[in-house]
Amino acid sequence: MTETLHIVGGGMAGSEAAWQAAQMGVSVVIHEMRPKVGTFAHKTGHLAEMVCSNSFRSDDDEQNAVGLLHWEMRAAGGLIMEMADAHALPAGGALAVDREPFAESVTARLHEHPNIRVEGTEITSLPAEGKWIIATGPLTSGALAEAIAAETGQESLAFFDAIAPILYFDSIDMTKAWMQSRYDKGETEEERTAYLNCPMDRDQYEAFIDALLAAEKTEFKPGETAGYFDGCLPIEVMAERGRETLRHGPMKPVGLTNPHQPDVKAHAVVQLRRDNALGTLYNIVGFQTKMKYGAQKEVLRMIPGLEEARFARLGGIHRNTFINAPTLLDDQMRLHSRPNLRFAGQITGVEGYVESAAMGLLAGRMAAAEILGTPLASPPQETAMGALIHHITGGAEAKTFQPMNVNFGLFPPLDGVRGGRRGRKERYKGYTDRAKAAWQGWLGQTALAAE
């Protein structure tokens, strides 16, 4: 008799992990505290309840990274995608879901599976023995959150987090921006050019501050705390404290020389920092924001060099429990200090329903393969799944790690494909064609593991 796999949390990730492992012949127990113990966001005791929007975003598997993730999950027999397709609503090129029947159907399928048992229990500590997947999401209960913090180090668990925007490097106008660290600090050329700089003159700065103060902001939701962490003040809050505050904070112009206009001293400078090992994504340093998405794009595109910016992720501030996965997890999503424990879903630092379910799919398959004595390698980075797991388990910068949606900036570059806006369609098709072939190859290895 094979070892039982225990899964804590019956959200998107936990539900998908359970399904994948059970389909491989492994006995699974899902520990879901709801409805006995509720949260301020959940309304039912159903598994895979959608508490935010009802959108799985774009379903285009040729030109969109999340659409590719849909394709990979469907190819892997994913329960979440099967039920989303069964309860899809008209939404153009997106996949929107009728959330209540969706959750009811996922719950029914899991309860009906002969290899799955669902227990309405709250897990309040990290188990010392057995194979476990922790998939408790951003609303992890207090006792378990404390146990995770004690095991990983308090600084590894964020309870309320600020997010700065991330954009694609190839959308930045380098005739206006330049690469330089303040005062040319660093021992290597890479260190001395670690930051990308966008200069503003006085008029541009004043117009930017006016737009920032006037922009529509998102208010805190009920149940969220309105306090800010030190060092994570939203830029609009700083601007409200004085028009010069940003110019003496994240936008200070000191220690920098614009090679495009070496004799002109900038009034303010916006800095961007590389956000992934590939150098395809950059985040705007110190630009945590509560501006609504539409206003955010409009205001940030006022920055010289970012007029045509394309965003991989927009900024925001919200409650989010997640671990610093790049320092804590191996490429099997196991905790370095406790290899019997895997983490999956939003708690690992992925953002979104689909990404959470995708990490559950991988965790379930890897855990099941390990139990069956045929361990699986992580999927290739060329796949959407592989790009995500690589990002959260080592590709991202640990010091600035923040939740991330899947996007093509996480994928290794293609050879011989034109860059920039004009080559985008060909480039994205190249990414998705390459990913599909690599994913099919990895699924073949998984099938052998289950035999």
From Swiss-Prot:
InterPro entries noted in UniProt = FAD/NAD-bd_sf (IPR036188), MnmG-rel (IPR002218), MnmG-rel_CS (IPR020595), MnmG_N (IPR040131), TrmFO (IPR004417)
Reactions accelerated catalytically: uridine(54) in tRNA + (6R)-5,10-methylene-5,6,7,8-tetrahydrofolate + NADH + H(+) = 5-methyluridine(54) in tRNA + (6S)-5,6,7,8-tetrahydrofolate + NAD(+); uridine(54) in tRNA + (6R)-5,10-methylene-5,6,7,8-tetrahydrofolate + NADPH + H(+) = 5-methyluridine(54) in tRNA + (6S)-5,6,7,8-tetrahydrofolate + NADP(+)
* GO CC aspect terms: cytosol
Q: Which domain of life is it from?
A: Bacteria
Give GO terms for biological process. tRNA methylation; tRNA wobble uridine modification
Give the main location.
cytoplasm
Which keywords belong to this entry?
Cytoplasm, FAD, Flavoprotein, Methyltransferase, NAD, NADP, Transferase, tRNA processing
Q: What is its EC number?
A: 2.1.1.74
Which PROSITE patterns has this protein been placed in?
A: GIDA_2 (PS01281)
For activity, the cofactor(s) needed are: FAD
UniProt lists the family membership as follows:
Belongs to the MnmG family. TrmFO subfamily.
Q: Provide the function of this protein.
A: Catalyzes the folate-dependent formation of 5-methyl-uridine at position 54 (M-5-U54) in all tRNAs.
Which NCBIfam families does the UniProt entry name for this protein? gid_trmFO, PRK05335.1
Its recorded name reads: Methylenetetrahydrofolate--tRNA-(uracil-5-)-methyltransferase TrmFO
Record the organism.
Answer: Dinoroseobacter shibae (strain DSM 16493 / NCIMB 14021 / DFL 12)
Q: What is the lineage of its organism?
A: Bacteria, Pseudomonadati, Pseudomonadota, Alphaproteobacteria, Rhodobacterales
